[in-house]
Every structure is written in structure tokens, then in C-alpha cells.
């Protein structure tokens, strides 16, 4: 499958870079959180509040199964999608996985700066929770095909496209 799958912590830039990558490569963009919101006709925050995290993770599994039939897509995942149910291995079968590795200090800055109601697991004052999440997830994220360690937007795009072309043998 020739998809690019962006994984990483909340606030790592998956959605933003995904939009630009899809334009550059002329691939359709799929945002897994947006798909779930459309399926449920509710925001992620509402889904968590009404049905709980387990229900949300089941929906993510359904999305992964649908994605197995897709090609030439840029897929931006929710931060937890690769973590649960060993989904990272399923994602690697679907396409080229890219871990957008952002230093914890930068994620904390972004969290404090961005008051975002859409992220049910993050509150703008909960740096301890973010630190714990980072520690618990990093090992799985690092199983991606490539790791982009860059907070510069343009350089990240260039690095992703280069790594993807190398993976494809172009």
C-alpha cells in the first residue's frame, strides 16, 4: 500500500503536516479523528464523555480495517491510535509510517499556548499527564518506518517526502 501515515503525540503537527503533504503528493487526506467524528456525528470530546475511551478505541479499529483497502492517501492518526491493540503493526502494513517526534518541552509549550477543547485527554494545565503520556507512548511510536525529529515545518515536509521516496525506491 502506498500511503503515508503520520503518528505522534497530540500537538506534534500531524494534521497540519498531513494537509500540506496531501497537496504536495496529490494524495487525499484522511484524518482518523475527523472520520470518527463524522461516523458518530459527535466531537471526540463528546464521544469520550458519553461512551468512554474503550468505545472510541473500537471505532479506531474499524477505521484501520477500512484503511487497509486504501492507497495513495496521507493518513493523520489520533495520538493514541498506534498505541492501543498493537495498532502500530497494522498501520505499518497499510503504508509508510512517520513518527513526528517533537521534544516534550515543545509539546508542553504548544499545549499551554493552545487551549483546545477537542483533545479529551489533554488539559492545558496538565503537564504531568502529558509527560507520562509521552513516556508511555514513545517506545511504540519509535517502531515507525521513519522518525522525523524536527520542529521546523518546511524541513519536516522535505524530510518526510525524501524518506517516503526512499522507502518506495524512487
Curated annotation (Swiss-Prot):
Q: Which reaction does it catalyse?
A: shikimate + ATP = 3-phosphoshikimate + ADP + H(+)
Where do the annotations place substrate binding? 33, 57, 79, 137
Quote the InterPro entries the UniProt record gives: P-loop_NTPase (IPR027417), Shikimate/glucono_kinase (IPR031322), Shikimate_kinase/TSH1 (IPR000623)
Q: Which BP terms in the Gene Ontology apply to this protein?
A: amino acid biosynthetic process; aromatic amino acid family biosynthetic process; chorismate biosynthetic process
> Sorted alphabetically, which keywords does the UniProt record give?
Amino-acid biosynthesis, Aromatic amino acid biosynthesis, ATP-binding, Cytoplasm, Kinase, Magnesium, Metal-binding, Nucleotide-binding, Transferase
Q: In which pathway does it act?
A: Metabolic intermediate biosynthesis; chorismate biosynthesis; chorismate from D-erythrose 4-phosphate and phosphoenolpyruvate: step 5/7
Q: Name one GO cellular component term.
A: cytosol
Q: What class of enzyme is it?
A: transferase
Q: How does it assemble?
A: Monomer.
What's the protein name?
Answer: Shikimate kinase
This protein's species is Clostridium botulinum (strain Loch Maree / Type A3)
Give the encoding gene's name. Answer: aroK
